[in-house]
Amino acid sequence: MSRYESCFAQLKANNQGAFVPFVTLGDPTPGQSVDVIKALIDGGADALELGLPFSDPVADGPMIQRANLRALESGTTFKHILEILKEIRDYSPQIPIGLLVYANLIYAKGVRNFYQQMKDAGVDSVLIADVPTKEAKRFADIAKEIGIEAVFIAPPDASDALLIDIAKQCAGYVYLLSRSGVTGADTQMQAPASELINKLKEAGAPPTLLGFGISQPEHVQRALAAGADGAISGSAVVALIEKNLDNNAQQVADLKAFVKSMKAATQLS
């Protein structure tokens, strides 16, 4: 059983949904990044979604773009990323670790080599932000060979054929977008995506996590009410890092408290 399967089975047994925070690796510095991610775990995160810093993160809004910039400006290297991932894996042997990455970063290392290095660092899944489902199969095939789960994005306007394709190829979980556009906590999540979720379930897809615009406990409750298995929050988490760049202790305390409040909203009645 994979870490994701164990995680979702445990949540189901406890009648809970998943809360998954997102941060950029190396933000604000490689050293502080470790403290940040440990705070997310200590706050009760069910899984982690971690971004590899990239100079042109087209799927992300201003908040996460600035996080990418901070990580790169602080000198975060690929070596640092592997070290951070290994330290987090040692800190929490069971938590599922997902990566959000842009294709250029994979090509730069060589596709097979990239996945192998991530597997060795303790990563469970990889989502490629800028590769459409149709073109992602070759990445997914290599990932599967190596033992990494390939996560796919299901957009809100996905056709039935695309949803079936996603259900077939996707592993770990499906990242379901609550709306189109770029990430951001200011843009509220749109109407519940229950129709899409039902279609994915019927097609045999892995669990669905709803993302984009998830910044308050009631957003988590709405995601679960729509039938999602959990919710991902990125910009709202990164905002707490940005707010306390000069105060590491406050940063950690705020992150822990935020995750705790979001996790509390995952309890199903």
Curated annotation (Swiss-Prot):
Pfam families recorded for this chain? Answer: Trp_syntA (PF00290)
Catalytic site positions: 49, 60
| Domain of life, source organism | Bacteria
- What is the reaction catalyzed? (1S,2R)-1-C-(indol-3-yl)glycerol 3-phosphate + L-serine = D-glyceraldehyde 3-phosphate + L-tryptophan + H2O
Which family, according to the similarity comment?
A: Belongs to the TrpA family.
Described by its record, this protein's role is as follows: The alpha subunit is responsible for the aldol cleavage of indoleglycerol phosphate to indole and glyceraldehyde 3-phosphate.
Per UniProt, subunit arrangement is: Tetramer of two alpha and two beta chains.
Listed name of the protein: Tryptophan synthase alpha chain
Species per Swiss-Prot/TrEMBL record: Idiomarina loihiensis (strain ATCC BAA-735 / DSM 15497 / L2-TR)
